[in-house]
Structure formats: C-alpha cells, structure tokens
Amino acid sequence: MLSTSTSLQGGKVSREEYRRQKDLEAARKAGTAPAALDEQGNAINPHIPEYITKAPWYADTGRPSLAHQRINEQGPHLKLDEWYDRGAKAGPAAKKYRKGACENCGAMTHKMKDCVERPRKRGAKFTNKDIAPDELVQQFEGDYDAKRDRWNGYDPASYKHVVEEYEATEQMRKKYREEEIDQQTSTDMAVVKKLAKKDKEGKVEDDDDDFGSSDEDEDDEDKYADAADQVGQKLDTKTRITVRNLRIREDTAKYLINLDESSAYYDPKTRSMRDAPVRNMNPEDMKFAGDNFQRYSGDATNMQKLQLFAWQSAQKGSNINVSANPTAGELLHREFQQKKEVLKDTNKTSILAKYGGEEHLQRMPNELLSGQTENYVEYSRSGQIIKGRERAKARSKYDEDVYINNHTAIWGSYYDLSTSQWGFACCHSVLPGSYCTGDAGKLANAASSASALLASSNERSKIEEAAEKERESLAEQHLKDLASGKAKKGKEREWDLPQYAKRREDGEELDLDKGRLKNALKEEKKRKKMGEDEAWQQTKKGKTDVTQEELEAYRLSRQAYDDPMSNYQDPEDQ
C-alpha cells in the first residue's frame, strides 16, 4: 500500500499516524479520498501493493512514485545512412609541420605509434614535405544493439557486382547451350532423315497444340531448358535423383487395387489395410496380401503372451497391469517362464527315474547319422580341437592327479622365481623325473640357490679381509707405534691449546680443563640470560668453533624436563 513521506523516509511512526495512514488508504480504495500523485502529477492507483510503489533505498526520492518501475527513455537511434565516412579528410594538407602532429606523416589526428602509413626514412617532422591531411574524426553514440549489429554500416549497393556477375554467367550458359544444341542437331543423321521424310510427304503441323508440340518446338525449348549443364558447376543435371520419400507412380496404391466398397477396409490415418484387397486368390500370386503379417512380426507375439499372462494372473488374484507398470509385468513373466522350465525339467527327470527309458531319448550325433558334416573343425597335432563349432576346454598335456617317484604333489605345483622353472611342491625339485627327497631337498635347493651362494661369498670375503689384517708385517706395526708416540708427544706440547669438540664414544672419558670448564659455565649462564636478539648478535660476533669445555658446559646447563631434580638450585649459586 502507499505510505506517507514519513514512512518513506524510514522514520518511526506513532500509533495515531499509523491509524491515519490506514484510514487514508481505505478511503482512497473506496474512492472517497483523492488518489496520490507522483512526481509528474499522475494519479497512482491505490490498489497497487506497497512493495511495488515503494522504491528501494538507493532510488528513494521521499515521495510516492512509480518511476522506478518504468524503463528509462533511450536516446535517439542511429539512422541507416548514418555511419562513419571512411577515408574522409578534414581539409587540405598543411604546408609545414605543426607541433603535436604525427612525426611520420604530419597529421594532427593521431600520433606516430598509431600512424597507418609506411614508416618513412625521415619523417615529416624533419623534412616538412608530403604532409598528410587530417582525417575526419566522427563520433557516434549508438545504443547496445547498434554497437553489436554486424550489418550496421553495410552498403547494399556493394552487392550489385555479385548480381551482375551472376547475370553474365547465366547469359554465357545459355549461349553455350545454344551452340551445343545447334552443333548436335546438324550432325545428327536421324534428325536429317526425319526432316527429309517430313518434307517429302508434305505433312502439315498437327492441330494438337493443347496436348503437345512438334519436334522443332522441343528443340527450341531445349536451348533454354533448366536441365542444361551450367558453367562453373560440377552437378550433372541429367542424372538428378528424385526425393526418396516420393512414391514411384508405376506401382499401384493399396487402396486402388480393388475399388469395391465391400472389399478390405483402408485406414487413411495409419495408411494400413489389414485384409487382402482381392479375395479368393492365392496370396503368393498377389502383389499385396494385406498388412496382417506385421501383427506377428517383431515383439508383437511376445507382447501378446505378456498380456495373456497378465489377464490370467489377474483372474487368480495377482495385481498385474501391463499398461500401468510394464516393467514389473515383464519381470514377473520372465520369472514365471524360468520356474515353468525348471518344473518341466523336474517332471521329466522324475518320470524317467520312475519308469526308465532314457536311452530311447538319446539321439546319435549328426556326424554318425549322416556320415558327414559341413561343420569345419581344425585339430592340433596332439588331437585337440583348435577351431570349430564344439571347442574343447583347455587341458594340460600331462596326466592329472598322478603321483610318480614317491612324490606327494604333482608336477607343476611349485614355481621357482629365481630360476623361472616349474617343479614339485613337496621337495622343490625342478627335474620332472627325479625322486622325492622331502624337506631335505627343500633345504638343499635353498642352499644352492643364487641368493644363498651370494650370501656365502660375502661371508668368505669378510673372513679373508680379517685374515689379511692379521698378516700385517712387524715393520708396519713398528711404524704405527712410532707414529702414535709422536702424536702423544705432540699432545703434551699442545696441552695449553683448546681441544675442539668431537663426538664422544660409548664409555670414553674426556680430559677437560677445570678452569676452562668453569669459565664456559659462566658464559653459558650469561648467554641464557640474554634476549633472543642480543644472543643472536653475540653469536655472530664470536667464534664459530666449539671446544670440549663449552660443549660440556652446554650439556650440564641444559634443562632436562624428565629429571625430578632439574629445578633444584644450590644455595651457594643463588
């Protein structure tokens, strides 16, 4: 409904104001109060809902209006003959180069990078010669459709040359056809004899113009016949094919075979005639014997069986409807057929088991009855069927389930991956004619395998290396002792130098200087009290090598979270 200016502006309305608005709306609907006016002074229908008359917040003007529901007026459209005048010049060319003009051609309407002329060796800016005139710049502000119209600005007069070319081709085609027919007529002996005979007998033209024409008229018409070969086309007009769905007029329609009203009925809607149009006639001698044969072709018979099954089931109380649920009916019918076949086989088996006579039902193969067959069968050298109607199943050439030479498994029950050979699973033997050796044979084959031989060769090489070390000469041992003695003396002389850190072996004790260790502990505590940035700056300024004492100080001062005494502090250190 329409609202007042207070409600349009979004202010809170009191009860009295809200009641006054409702009364005004009711009066406007009843016609006792004048209707509201919009910005243009037009009356607004009071029956229009409020959600239509109320403008959104971004288009609200504070007054009731329907301007937001109307389409904005569009500007004038471009005319058909109003378009860019391509290649038009604004005036004569200048004589001197002007400041701000194109450096290449000298025009004022574009810059050098947008110039479409060939780049000159020396531009017009430096030569003041051959200055191009200014182009005529036109501005057209078209609407959305005008900017996207592919035919906007197209000149229909430009298609005139296509029409002229087609007319010239058509004239040449007619002229070529006339010359071809004239040449063919002059050389045709049959036409010459016919004309001579006609002149000799002195016959006049027939007066059957309404039903035909003379040969001369036909010859003249052939000159302009549409069936003539056209120049520039590969289509042979003499061998045109008619449309496939057009019936050839040589055959007779089924409803025209017998015009007797009491004959077979023809249904024009389905174009079908079920019965034969001519009675008392052999169907084999008839060209058309009716469309009833189609009722027994395809799935028509199966559909009749399905419908019969549905009717019989409905009589017995089953709710089967082929039209309402054809899928369920098809599934039930298929299940019924399967059960029927099973029951038929069961009855046959029980009767044969009770009364006998199964041997009389067995039939000899066709090969034995006729003595020969046309079925192609191809056999292998071992007598197996390779190709034919009855292909035998693939079977092994070895005797199955035959245990030889005390084996408990057949040949081929084991496959050795290392040697890619088949064998017996009971003893892992890969020889077909070997005797079974049981678990001892498995161990022997495992020991003689390639992996076991490689492992034994590795152990042998290790033993040889150990023996080689034991065979070192006394001279080499003496040289090593001398070298170790010099190293010890060097260590005594270098006792005052710092010992750099190395990995401690298991059970090895390091000789640490107590004074250096104490100083390292103080430095480590001082480093931990520093901030992160300050410690990083101090680390960059210091040395990069770590001594054994510094490493030991780090280990001693490192906090162990799983140590119950990690938080204990000596009173002397506090």
From Swiss-Prot:
Residues 1-42, 195-231, 481-548, 555-574 are annotated as: Disordered. One of its GO terms (cellular component) is spliceosomal complex. Residues 204-223 have a biased composition (Acidic residues). It is found in: Nucleus. Residues 13-28, 491-524 have a biased composition (Basic and acidic residues). One of its GO terms (biological process) is RNA splicing. Signal peptide: none annotated. A zinc finger (CCHC-type) spans 100-117. Keywords: Metal-binding, mRNA processing, mRNA splicing, Nucleus, Spliceosome, Zinc, Zinc-finger. InterPro entries: Slu7_dom (IPR021715), Splicing_factor_SLU7 (IPR039974). Belongs to the SLU7 family. Associated with the spliceosome. Involved in pre-mRNA splicing. PANTHER family: PRE-MRNA-SPLICING FACTOR SLU7 (PTHR12942:SF2), STEP II SPLICING FACTOR SLU7 (PTHR12942). This is Pre-mRNA-splicing factor SLU7. The lineage of its organism: Eukaryota, Fungi, Dikarya, Basidiomycota, Agaricomycotina.
